[in-house]
Design a protein with these regions (language model features):
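Non-heme di-metal
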Residues: 1-123
């Protein structure tokens, strides 16, 4: 919060605006910045470094895709709501909740629903 007074007039923008800004930043990083770094490294004969810049660019591209998916879910109103029963995981304490939405507050650690995510099944 220390730094927010220097950004956006000290106000915290809405989540969707923050996600759009983040997605735009990631887009710049993979499509322009790291691509340029890779090109310059190749031109200077640093093939391994060029490869690493390209690989990091792909990671940044996946970040942009993730932010855009979150924006889409926000617009659809499904970040914290699904049609059928869903397994929700509290990322603070590990509490499991099954339902269409997570609870407003975790019954174990008392953190708000923003700390819940859909439980991943990839181990």
């Amino acid at each position: 919060k220390l730094w927010f007074k220097f950004l956006h007039g000290g106000e915290i923008p809405a989540t969707e605006a923050n996600l759009r800004d983040a997605a735009a930043g990631e887009h710049f990083e993979w499509s322009d910045m790291y691509a340029q770094f890779a090109q310059e490294a190749k031109e200077e004969g640093f093939d391994k470094i060029a490869y690493l810049f390209e690989a990091v660019g792909e990671i940044e591209k996946s970040h942009e895709q993730r932010y855009n998916k979150l924006i889409e879910d926000l617009e659809k109103g499904i970040v914290f709501s699904r049609e059928g029963d869903t397994v929700w995981l509290c990322t603070v304490c590990g509490h499991i909740h099954i339902g269409k939405e997570p609870p407003m507050q975790c019954p174990v650690c008392s953190n708000p629903k923003g700390y819940f995510k859909i439980k991943p099944e990839n181990y």
